[in-house]
């Protein structure tokens, strides 16, 4: 197992695609983010590389995926803040300020399935998507519309759809 700080640096870089964003979001200096992601990658026997302005991993991620599931379970139990990808909706009153108990981030890759990829890899816990641009339905995903004046909704893993902390977030956001 690795510390929350080490895994946050590695996963934050893969999620947000910017060391500066990771540092700001997880309150780490950018050099600390770099050092931590390297240590974390080394523990799992993988490497990070940048190709066409996108951070990716190289190597067998089996142990890393198991570790991510453990960390996500801890977040869902309230042991640390949950993560939500908001796809550039920072100006929305729903996310400024961030909901209590949540880390709000927006990757540099809005136009591709990056947020859903991070979501499926257990890097983030919820992904906000415009209802006009939702991922194709699959058996493991649930789409929860927010029914606000702006048409957007959350994509969550079906197994987490009724999880207490996620339900609380959705209830709170529907009140805004």
Identify the function of each model-found stretch.
Residues 89-92, 111, 132-137, 160-162:
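Short acidic, S/G/P-rich loop/turn micro-motifs used as interaction or catalytic elements
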Residues 33, 165-176:
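Bilobed periplasmic-binding protein/Venus flytrap-like ligand-binding cleft at the lobe interface
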Residues 46-47, 135-154:
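Ligand-binding "clamshell"
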Residues 80-84, 124-126, 154:
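Hydrophobic beta-strand segments of well-ordered beta-sheets in folded domains
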Residues 151-165:
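A bilobed periplasmic-binding-protein/Venus flytrap-type ligand-binding module shared by bacterial periplasmic
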Residues 25, 110-127, 131-135:
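Short helices/loops that flank or line small-molecule/ion binding pockets
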Residues 86, 129, 156-158:
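Short beta-strand/turn micro-motifs composed of small residues
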Residues 1-110:
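N-terminal hydrophobic or amphipathic helices and topogenic motifs
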């Amino acid at each position: 197992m690795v510390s929350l700080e080490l895994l946050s640096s590695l996963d934050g870089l893969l999620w947000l695609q910017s060391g500066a964003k990771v540092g700001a979001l997880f309150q780490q200096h950018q050099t600390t983010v770099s050092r931590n992601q390297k240590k974390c990658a080394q523990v799992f026997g993988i490497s990070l590389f940048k190709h066409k302005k996108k951070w990716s991993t190289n190597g067998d991620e089996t142990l890393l995926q198991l570790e991510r599931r453990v960390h996500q379970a801890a977040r869902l139990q309230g042991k640390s803040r949950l993560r939500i990808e908001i796809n550039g909706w920072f100006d929305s009153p729903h996310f400024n300020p961030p909901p209590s108990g949540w880390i709000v981030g927006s990757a540099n890759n809005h136009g591709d399935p990056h947020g859903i990829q991070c979501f499926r890899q257990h890097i983030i816990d919820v992904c906000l998507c415009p209802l006009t641009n939702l991922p194709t339905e699959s058996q493991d995903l649930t789409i929860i519309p927010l029914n606000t004046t702006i048409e957007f909704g959350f994509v969550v893993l079906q197994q987490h759809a009724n999880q207490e902390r996620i339900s609380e977030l959705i209830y709170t956001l529907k009140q805004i």
